[in-house]
């Protein structure tokens, strides 16, 4: 309650440009998360800032003679990185805010731009390894051998025909980009 002013259905924080923290859970969980952030928030923020800077300076090697285009490319790099998450292993969300789940085919289509052209080969390899763990391995299943179409915390769907071939294509692309044929 401290530092907030209520305006109708809106809330204005009194903490200026530093933003605000929102937690969800029991009161005890929320207090624990806030205390954790208070003790390490500045360090976390500095680490995040360093990560974003390295994404832009080390991984985004595309530069033009148009500053506005360069800025847009930087934003695309950072925005795409925000979609790389940990849910059921490492993966790429299909899109936020509505598609905060892994769609196999979409993930494999976006992987070159999200990971490979930026040189984040270890992340791409981990995504493939983690998604391979979700393969249907039940010989009695009608979707036996398939890579999921969709994976979220509620379950896994195998209702696609192109997810598995796209998985194989991306494994080949990771090998081609990284030179690592033994991963």
Task: Place the predicted regions along the sequence by residue.
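Aromatic-rich carbohydrate-recognition surfaces in CAZymes
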Residues: 100-107, 111-183
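Acidic/polar, glycine-enriched structural segments that form the non-catalytic walls/loops
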Residues: 1-100, 181-183
């Amino acid at each position: 309650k401290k530092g907030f002013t209520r305006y109708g259905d809106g809330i204005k924080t009194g903490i200026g440009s530093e933003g605000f923290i929102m937690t969800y859970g029991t009161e005890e969980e929320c207090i624990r998360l806030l205390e954790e952030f208070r003790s390490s928030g500045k360090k976390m923020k500095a680490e995040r800032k360093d990560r974003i800077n390295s994404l832009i300076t080390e991984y985004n090697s595309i530069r033009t003679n148009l500053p506005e285009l360069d800025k847009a490319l930087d934003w695309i790099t950072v925005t795409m990185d925000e979609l790389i998450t940990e849910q059921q292993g490492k993966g790429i969300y299909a899109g936020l805010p509505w598609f905060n789940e892994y769609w196999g085919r979409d993930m494999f289509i976006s992987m070159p731009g999200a990971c490979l052209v930026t040189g984040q080969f270890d992340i791409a390899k981990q995504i493939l390894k983690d998604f391979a763990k979700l393969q249907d391995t039940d010989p009695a299943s009608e979707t036996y051998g398939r890579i999921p179409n969709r994976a979220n915390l509620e379950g896994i769907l195998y209702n696609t025909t192109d997810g598995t071939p796209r998985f194989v294509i991306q494994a080949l692309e990771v090998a081609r980009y990284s030179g690592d044929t033994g991963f």
